[in-house]
Design a protein with these regions (language model features):
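A generic, well-ordered mixed alpha/beta core segment in the N-terminal half of proteins
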Residues: 79-169, 177-178
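Secondary-shell segments that build the walls of catalytic and ion/ligand-binding clefts
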Residues: 196-266
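Active-site cofactor/substrate anionic-group-binding motifs, chiefly glycine-
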Residues: 47-101
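Catalytic-core signal marking the mid-to-C-terminal active-site face
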Residues: 2-14, 252, 257, 262-376
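Phosphate/diphosphate-binding glycine-rich loops and adjacent basic-rich segments that engage nucleotide
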Residues: 147-221
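Acidic, glycine/proline-rich low-complexity segments that act as flexible tails and inter-domain linkers
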Residues: 1-8, 13-32, 37-38, 45-66, ...
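Residues forming anionic-ligand binding surfaces in small-molecule and nucleic-acid pockets
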Residues: 73-83, 94-110, 211-231
C-alpha cells in the first residue's frame, strides 16, 4: 500500500464534518480536529487521521460519551483533579491544561490530574498550549496496557508518553515520546503496511521477541500476554528498567494522583476506558527574569546544534525542530495519508452516510485492501 497527499484544508474540512456527525459541538470539534491534524502535520501519522475510526468505534461501544463534560472534583490554588466522565480525551485534556495554565499565571505553578478520560492524541499538543504562553508545559497519559515490564511477559503499563515544551528562539523546545520503544499506533501502521516489525520492539505471548505485528496487536487486544518493550528494550543491561521507571512516573501523575484507573485495568470495562492524564504548567518567572531565562535556554540549544557532528552527519537537531520542518513541508506540499487509512475513512463515510467522493475527488479506492468492507 502506498500514500496519497491531501491539502491541509481538505483534511480539515473532512475532520470537521465527521466530528460534527459524531455529535460534538463546533468548539469541541475545533479542538479535536486541531489535535489530530497537528499530529499529521508534525509527521506523527500514528496519532493523526488514522485514529478516527477507533474514536468512532469507541462512541458506538459507549466507551466515549460525546455529551460528557469535564468536572473539577478537587482543587487547591496550585492543583486540581478533574473527572472527565468518559468524554472525548482531547476536550477533557484541553480543559485540564487551560486550568493548569490559569493556576500557573496566578501562583507560578499549576498541576492537574485527570481520571475517567479517553485517548487524547499527542501529548505534545497540550505541553505546547503552555509554552505558547511563555510557560513550561508538561503532559502525560496512561493508556491500555501495552508495555511489558522488565523481566515480565504480560503488558502492565501503557505507552505512557511524557511531553515537555518550553519557549525558545529561533525554535521552541518540544520533547514528546512514549516510555515504550514505540507506541501501539506505530504497530498499527506496520500492520497496515504489511511489513514485519523491527527487532527490539515487541514480545509475543510467551515473552519472546516478535516481529509479527498482527499477532502482537491481537495479543494486546485479547490480553493474551506479550506487548511492546519499554525504552531500553527487554533487558536490564540495555536500560529496560529506565523506560519502565519513566512509565511509572507518568502513571503517578495521571492515575495515582487522580485516584483513577491504572494502566493494567484501562480499557477492560464494557462501558468505559478509564484513561488518566497529568498536566503541569510552570512560570519561569518564579526562578527569575523570564526573558533572561528564555535567552539563556535559547543560547544553550544553539550550542547543542553547533556542537561537533558525527562523521557523515550534516545537522544536529534539538527537540521540536523536526516537527517544525515537517509542518512547513506538509502545509506546502500536502499531508500523506496511507491508502489503508483512506479505505477505513471511506468505510466510515458509508456508515455515517457521508459522501466520501465529495471530500476526496478522483481518489480510487484499492478494493483489494484487507481493510475494505464496503460499508464499515
Amino acid at each position: 500500500m502506498g500514500y496519497v497527499k491531501w491539502s491541509y484544508d481538505t483534511l480539515d474540512k473532512f475532520c470537521h464534518d465527521v466530528f460534527r456527525k459524531f455529535g460534538f459541538d463546533e468548539d469541541e470539534t475545533e479542538i479535536i480536529k486541531d489535535v489530530l491534524l497537528t499530529a499529521d502535520l508534525y509527521g506523527i501519522e500514528s496519532h493523526g487521521m488514522q485514529r478516527m475510526v477507533r474514536y468512532d468505534k469507541g462512541i458506538e461501544r459507549g466507551t466515549i460519551h460525546p455529551d460528557a463534560k469535564p468536572e473539577v472534583v478537587f482543587e487547591t490554588p496550585v492543583s486540581a483533579v478533574i473527572d472527565g466522565h468518559d468524554g472525548m480525551g482531547q476536550i477533557i485534556s484541553h480543559f485540564a491544561m487551560e486550568k493548569a495554565i490559569e493556576k500557573a499565571k496566578k501562583t507560578g505553578v499549576g498541576f492537574v490530574s485527570v481520571r475517567n478520560s479517553n485517548h487524547f492524541g499527542i501529548a505534545g499538543y497540550y505541553a505546547e498550549m503552555a509554552s505558547k504562553q511563555g510557560l513550561l508545559g508538561m503532559a502525560c497519559t496512561n493508556s491500555e496496557a501495552i508495555m511489558v515490564p522488565t523481566f515480565g511477559r504480560k503488558a502492565m503499563l501503557g505507552s505512557n508518553p511524557i511531553a515537555v515544551a518550553m519557549s525558545a528562539e529561533p525554535y521552541p523546545f518540544l520533547f514528546d515520546c512514549s516510555t515504550t520503544v514505540v507506541t501501539r499506533g506505530k504497530l498499527e501502521m506496520y500492520n497496515k503496511s504489511g511489513k514485519p516489525l523491527p527487532k527490539g520492539w515487541a514480545l509475543d505471548a510467551n515473552g519472546q521477541e516478535s516481529t509479527d505485528a498482527p499477532d502482537v496487536l491481537a495479543n494486546i487486544v485479547g490480553k493474551k500476554g506479550g506487548g511492546i518493550m519499554p525504552l531500553g528494550g527487554n533487558k536490564e543491561a540495555s536500560g529496560s528498567h529506565k523506560g519502565y521507571g519513566y512509565g511509572m512516573l507518568c502513571e503517578i501523575f495521571s492515575s495515582i494522583f487522580s485516584m483513577g484507573v491504572t494502566s493494567d485495568k484501562c480499557c477492560t470495562f464494557k462501558d468505559r476506558n478509564g484513561i488518566c492524564h497529568g498536566f503541569a504548567a510552570i512560570d519561569p518567572a518564579i526562578f527569575g527574569n523570564a526573558e533572561d531565562i528564555k535567552a539563556h535556554f535559547s543560547e544553550f540549544l544553539e550550542t547543542l546544534r553547533q556542537s561537533p557532528k558525527a562523521e557523515g552527519v550534516e545537522r544536529i537537531y534539538t527537540h521540536g525542530e523536526k516537527e517544525i520542518l515537517a509542518e512547513k513541508e506538509r502545509r506546502e506540499n500536502g499531508i500523506p495519508v496511507n491508502d489503508n487509512t483512506m479505505v477505513e475513512l471511506a468505510n466510515l463515510c458509508n456508515y455515517l452516510k457521508m459522501d466520501f467522493g465529495a471530500y476526496f475527488e478522483d481518489y480510487e479506492l484499492p478494493k483489494d485492501s484487507k481493510f475494505f468492507s464496503g460499508n464499515y
